[in-house]
Regions:
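Helix N-cap at the beta1-alpha1 junction of Rossmann-like dinucleotide-binding domains, i.e.
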Residues: 36-40
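ADP-ribose/adenylate-binding Rossmann-like module
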Residues: 89-100
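Conserved Rossmann-fold cofactor-binding substructure of NAD(P)-dependent oxidoreductases
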Residues: 56-70, 82
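Beta-loop-alpha module in the N-terminal Rossmann-like domain of NAD(P)-dependent dehydrogenases
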Residues: 73-90
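Conserved beta-strand positions in the Rossmann-like core of class I SAM-dependent methyltransferases
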Residues: 29-32
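Conserved N-terminal Rossmann-fold NAD(P)-binding element of oxidoreductases
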Residues: 4-11
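Hydrophobic/small residue at the entry helix of a nucleotide-binding pocket
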Residues: 12-16
Length: 100
């Protein structure tokens, strides 16, 4: 199964997360929803069987490394000033990334 990492579970992410989860079964996706606010990530995951909600501190290099390496694609829903830190890791680990 393809691993999709969505970093950020705020209001603008909810529609994308809902779409990814709705398509996950037929497309073979596991969607990890990562946010500093675990309750927000859990709420966005909708307890879907193909979702995983995690606490995520974008400033924690080790955690970024672990989660990005596990992923096939990374979607950054973070504020624009935080995209660069994620983008650099995606380049280093040769992972696809998109910013929405």
């Amino acid at each position: 199964m393809k691993q999709i990492l969505v970093i950020g579970a705020g209001r603008s992410a909810v529609i994308l997360i809902d779409y990814l989860l709705n398509e996950s079964s037929k497309c073979g996706w596991i969607v990890t929803i990562a946010d500093y606010n675990l309750e927000l990530a859990e709420s966005a995951s909708l307890n879907h069987k193909n979702s995983r909600a995690i606490f995520f501190d974008v400033n924690d290099y080790k955690q970024r490394e672990v989660e990005i390496k596990k992923s096939d694609i990374v979607v950054s829903m973070l504020p624009s000033n935080m995209h660069l830190i994620v983008a650099k890791d995606c380049l280093n680990f040769k992972k696809e990334m998109c910013v929405i």
